[in-house]
From Swiss-Prot:
Cellular compartments annotated: Cytoplasm, Cytosol; Cytoplasm
InterPro entries: Ribosomal_eL36 (IPR000509), Ribosomal_eL36_sf (IPR038097)
Example GO molecular function: structural constituent of ribosome
GO CC annotations, alphabetized: cytoplasm; cytosol; cytosolic large ribosomal subunit; cytosolic ribosome; membrane; nucleolus; synapse
Keyword Acetylation assigned: yes
Positions where N6-acetyllysine occurs in the chain: 62
Protein name, as recorded: Large ribosomal subunit protein eL36
Main function: Component of the large ribosomal subunit. The ribosome is a large ribonucleoprotein complex responsible for the synthesis of proteins in the cell.
Family the UniProt entry places it in: Belongs to the eukaryotic ribosomal protein eL36 family.
A Pfam family the protein falls into: Ribosomal_L36e
Keywords linked to the UniProt accession: Acetylation, Cytoplasm, Ribonucleoprotein, Ribosomal protein
Superkingdom field: Eukaryota
Subunit structure: Component of the large ribosomal subunit.
Gene of this entry: RPL36
Amino acid sequence: MALRYPMAVGLNKGHKVTKNVSKPRHSRRRGRLTKHTKFVRDMIREVCGFAPYERRAMELLKVSKDKRALKFIKKRVGTHIRAKRKREELSNVLAAMRKAAAKKD
């Protein structure tokens, strides 16, 4: 514990020390997006487009049925967290499409 106040008792007692900061373990990087992975996924998305369930979810998001879209995606992808991430991704795509359309006009 670092000595914050010159006191002999209490939570702040003891010698002044520097915290030994260890770098994060390599096992913690699992699932982190790399530049290469991002490039490959973007390329595949450009070539293949969206899956039918993603297109339907986007239609639901267009008409502001966010909760219905979440339930629909959850049924397709399995877990609540994955469904939330997918819904967020699709809403970002829709926002980008809207922005591109506005810029075009």
